[in-house]
Amino acid sequence: MKRLIYTLCLIIGCATLSEAKVLTGHKTRLTDNWLYLRGDIGNIWEAVRPAAPGSSECVPLWTPVTLPHCFNATDAVDPDMNYYQGPGWYKTLLDIQNPYPNGRILLDFEGAGQKTEVYIYTTRVASHIGGYDEWT
């Protein structure tokens, strides 16, 4: 009897799994349209405040980059100078269109190094400490 119940549960479970619709997500690589600042900012508002490019309010100056990007790729290999070990900031604008009711968007970082903090506008939403590991 136990074997029959187990077999029925297994059949029902397999039938349920075979009919389940798995919604696969859409992946978009966010490699373009990034800005980078070598150095620190006073607070997160300085990274998100609107300022026209080239205006006097666009200070500190942000440099356009494509990811992956290493902010000390040149000075780290020069034996005659100390390489930069300070903070660096990256920012971009994302147009998020979630097609699923009550769905969610996941940001998967393929590699963010050492100490990373992620902000959406001015709210810190995630952090990571470690090597260039992948994390979500």
Region annotations inferred by a language model:
Residues 19-77, 81:
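Accessory carbohydrate-binding/adhesion or oligomerization-edge regions at the termini
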Residues 2-10:
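Sec-dependent signal peptide recognition
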Residues 9-18:
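Hydrophobic h-region of N-terminal signal peptides that target proteins for export
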Residues 1, 19, 89-92:
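Intrinsically disordered, low-complexity sequence elements enriched in Ser/Thr/Gly/Pro
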Residues 4, 23-24, 77-79, 102, ...:
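Hydrophobic alpha-helical context, especially transmembrane and signal-peptide helices
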